[in-house]
Amino acid sequence: MSASIPETMKAVVIENGKAVVKQDIPIPELEEGFVLIKTVAVAGNPTDWKHIDFKIGPQGALLGCDAAGQIVKLGPNVDAARFAIGDYIYGVIHGASVRFPSNGAFAEYSAISSETAYKPAREFRLCGKDKLPEGPVKSLEGAVSLPVSLTTAGMILTHSFGLDMTWKPSKAQRDQPILFWGGATAVGQMLIQLAKKLNGFSKIIVVASRKHEKLLKEYGADELFDYHDADVIEQIKKKYNNIPYLVDCVSNTETIQQVYKCAADDLDATVVQLTVLTEKDIKEEDRRQNVSIEGTLLYLIGGNDVPFGTFTLPADPEYKEAAIKFIKFINPKINDGEIHHIPVKVYKNGLDDIPQLLDDIKHGRNSGEKLVAVLK
């Protein structure tokens, strides 16, 4: 069963090292458990431009990982009791994928796994605003800002660090602090909210620009250190010399060194990063036996092997099941207003704005906000 669907569409693809808007792109085929949406809103992520610049995504692959829209077709073995044509959903897509290059969020139609899709409790549409302050999810612009960052944050806290999915327990699950470096990033803001609601740690320490302090403390941060301070690491270590849980929400070769230095002196400590950084990226003289570096790559959510640059990440069924469990747990909390979307800036020219949107992310023109494009 399906609505009227064209044979081709407009989409943003990788072409000669750039994000290029193209016409006459085939509509993606539906694999088992997937639904096809007519895309209404999309959001950008650093991984989008990195797939281009680092040559991870193949030539001609469709870009984009966050999409929201209306279901127009159900694929094989989709639970018809949960999903129907006409429903609005939002979710994660592996854009610029080697395995599935014909599917990406930055397109008029996208395929989303029904197993990992988010679904609003009531139908909502575009609000039409240029900017959205942070708040409960009441529009598609707000909804589409969530999937990649919220699911990543959930996987870090519940899968990497093993927190129970218990909402607002009276006692902290870990009687130790956690540090989020890049607390104002999209993932950082989700981590703070989740860590607070799960009461995961004795203290939530964040590193971010001082201008974001009010919002981040409203989300649940206990203390903020400004990364602009030349002695920020010394400030942190002076007050907290035994932080066993750390997340590098920026995850580049500079920040991983900084976060690593903040790790506990006397306890075993784990630094979680969001790309493929390892101990080899730490200066040899700074490496310590008690500090390990782990990663979380949301692309494993699909349950398949993931070709990623020069290597392939093996399929991780446990990761996929953990993600499905987390989304099932957190979806009602979003619908109840317990989890907020972060500030959103909206681009109004649809897919034509995507090259500029990605350039703005790449060059840091957004600060503490998610960049969203709405399709006409």
Swiss-Prot record:
Disulphide bridges, residue numbers: none
Matching InterPro entries: ADH-like_C, ADH-like_N, GroES-like_sf, NAD(P)-bd_dom_sf, PKS_ER, Trans-enoyl_RdTase-like
GO biological process terms held by the UniProt record: response to furfural
Domain of life the protein comes from: Eukaryota
CDD domains reported in the protein's UniProt record: enoyl_reductase_like
GO molecular function per UniProt: aldehyde dehydrogenase (NAD+) activity; oxidoreductase activity, acting on NAD(P)H
Gene3D superfamilies according to UniProt: Medium-chain alcohol dehydrogenases, catalytic domain (3.90.180.10), NAD(P)-binding Rossmann-like Domain (3.40.50.720)
A Pfam family the protein falls into: ADH_N
Family: Belongs to the YCR102c/YLR460c/YNL134c family.
Other comments on record: Present with 3490 molecules/cell in log phase SD medium.
Stated name of the protein: Uncharacterized protein YNL134C
Annotated source species: Saccharomyces cerevisiae (strain ATCC 204508 / S288c) (Baker's yeast)
